[in-house]
Amino acid sequence: MYYAKSALKNLSQGERLKYIRRYRHMTADDVAEYFGFGGKDPHKTFNSYENNCREPSKMRLKEIAGLYEVSVNAIKKYDFNSPIDVIYFHMWLEEEFPYYEIKFNYSNYEKTDYNEIIQNAIREWQQMRVKREKLEILDEDYFEWKLNFMKDTLKLVISGKSKSDCFVAEYVK
């Protein structure tokens, strides 16, 4: 017997929530039970998150991240004012289109804090991709790394000087 990862249908927050839930081998009922949802359709609230009919609150998002053992940044709705949102968007895009490449001409980009964070993160990501391609790490380890990317180190990277950086940092506290 083997397990094949389900396909990511799109990059919406709801689809990412569903994708990770399935990856963790959980049902909607498992999640409803964990959160203590009751009533006739206990998984209705969570289904509305996965179907993009409702957005989880910041507190609920932190709780979901805890249940799924992922960074909140992997499952939050992206606004792209934050460099972390850009990085995670590309990582999720790779789940939809495996092995796509990002090429940078590092000498031609504007030297801003935003771009530096993206450049450093992509460089680290490229190193992990190489490890996966050389079979130094398993695909599962690579995906876990992406789900938890910068979860513990984000506080050190983000200075909190700009509004978008503060938004990212508040999820990590």
Model-predicted segments: where are they?
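Short, Lys/Arg-enriched N-terminal segment that forms or immediately precedes the first helix
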Residues: 1-5
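Charged, helix-prone or intrinsically disordered regulatory segments positioned adjacent to compact structured domains
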Residues: 6-11, 19, 55, 59-62, ...
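Residue-level signal for the short linker/turn that defines the boundary of a DNA-recognition helix
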Residues: 12-15, 25-26, 41, 56-59
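Short basic helix-loop element that most often maps to the first helix and adjoining turn
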Residues: 14-35
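Recognition helix of helix-turn-helix/homeodomain-like DNA-binding domains
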Residues: 36-56, 77-81
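Mature, Sec-exported extracytoplasmic domains of Gram-positive
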Residues: 40, 50, 121-123, 132, ...
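Short, charged, amphipathic alpha-helical segments
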Residues: 139-147
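Short, charge-rich amphipathic alpha-helical segments embedded
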Residues: 150-164
